[in-house]
């Protein structure tokens, strides 16, 4: 067989293998980063102006889409809301009176979790600050922003310098998941 034909055959095989590998990786990524509760996520991300990919990433990171998840500190549901945060949101911001057991309901949990992200965004220009506050608390983020060790401009955090390891890792993990969701579902090829 002539050398040129061998090169062409190897090139075609390499290209086919590349496409199959990429297809397989995307298939695995879609299994590990699913689109669940789409109706609720689209509804509340639009209503409260929070990027859909970010909401999916928070749910993936917080509960891996397990609506009955409960953390060791008592956070409940898909977006792992603390009962006290839920009560504060429902009574003081949305003038509703709901039982904390409603946090197990996917739509309820997504609605109030997305509202909470949106509310935190009113304090910060940066989604990383929002995520840090969602995980580590508003007061802590405000203190970090005032400290040059953690913020160079008083508006954004230096992620690798967030003093709480859990919060630092949380922000990184959500960002990674958000990038994956953007790539898989929300960007045009």
Q: Where are the regions that the model predicts?
A:
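N-terminal Lys/Arg-rich, disordered targeting/topogenic segments
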Residues: 1-2
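Hydrophobic membrane-insertion alpha-helices, especially the h-region
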Residues: 5-23
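Catalytic glycan-binding domains that act on GlcNAc-containing polysaccharides
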Residues: 20-189
């Amino acid at each position: 067989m002539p050398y040129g034909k061998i090169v062409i055959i190897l090139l075609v095989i390499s290209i086919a293998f590349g496409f199959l590998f990429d297809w397989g990786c995307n298939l695995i990524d879609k299994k590990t980063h699913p689109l669940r509760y789409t109706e609720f996520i689209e509804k509340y991300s639009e209503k409260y102006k929070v990027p859909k990919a970010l909401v999916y990433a928070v749910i993936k990171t917080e509960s891996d889409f397990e609506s009955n998840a409960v953390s060791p500190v008592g956070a409940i549901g898909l977006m792992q809301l603390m009962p006290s945060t839920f009560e504060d949101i429902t009574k003081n911001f949305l003038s509703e009176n709901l039982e904390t057991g409603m946090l197990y309901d996917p739509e309820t949990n997504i609605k109030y979790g997305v509202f909470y992200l949106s509310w935190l965004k009113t304090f910060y220009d940066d989604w990383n600050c929002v995520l840090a506050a969602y995980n580590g608390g508003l007061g802590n983020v405000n203190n970090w922003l005032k400290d040059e060790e953690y913020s160079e401009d008083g508006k954004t955090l230096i992620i690798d310098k967030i003093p709480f390891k859990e919060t630092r890792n949380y922000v990184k993990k959500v960002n990674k998941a958000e990038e994956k969701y953007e790539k898989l579902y929300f960007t045009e090829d």
